[in-house]
Every structure is written in C-alpha cells, then in structure tokens.
C-alpha cells in the first residue's frame, strides 16, 4: 500500500545528486588538479565487496577513455574521489561520465546498484 508516509522513502537506493570540485563548488563542473567531491545517497564504497567508480570521456583524438578511480572515503551522503591524476590534463569543456557501481546494504549479498552522472571540465 502506497501512502504519503512513503513518498520520500529512498532508503536502500543509490543516488548521485551532485559532483563538483572542492574549490569551484559549481555543481557538475570539475576543475583539473582539484579534489572531486560527490554528494548523494548510499555512497559507501568497499573495494572488498567489488564496488567500483569509473570516469569516462572522449579524448582529443576521438577515442573513448575510461579510468578506474579509488575513492579516498565514502559515507552515506558523500564521497571524496581525491585528485585523480588521470583527469588532471583534461581540457575545459570535456564531458566526463562518472559511473558508480556500489553494493547498497549491510548484507554480504547486498545487490549492486549503478548510478551515472555526467559533468564537464571547467
């Protein structure tokens, strides 16, 4: 039965609501060489459980590039991707798609959920 009390019940779902460089604070804009912060829900990262975060973009030669990122930390509402060396030389205007594959829940067999968000380099 769906009722008003369930309208905002998002517990158990992965969500990426904003990605920004620590200094710019402009949502969905990252700056080369700056720390990248992610805000959302259920952003707990565990490499041991098989979680992954990747960044993909098209380089100047038209080739698709993808790199795996290792978050420095992740909690429920936030994740720190550090200063990814692979993204340090991207030119302004480049679109980067971040893909988060995280197991949400405490159980060992918690389901993997996927969230994507595209940002641009400022």
State the predicted function of each range.
Residues 61-82:
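Solvent-exposed serine/threonine-rich low-complexity stretches and specific carbohydrate-binding patches
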Residues 31, 74-76, 89-93:
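Surface-exposed coil/turn segments at beta-strand junctions on protein surfaces, enriched
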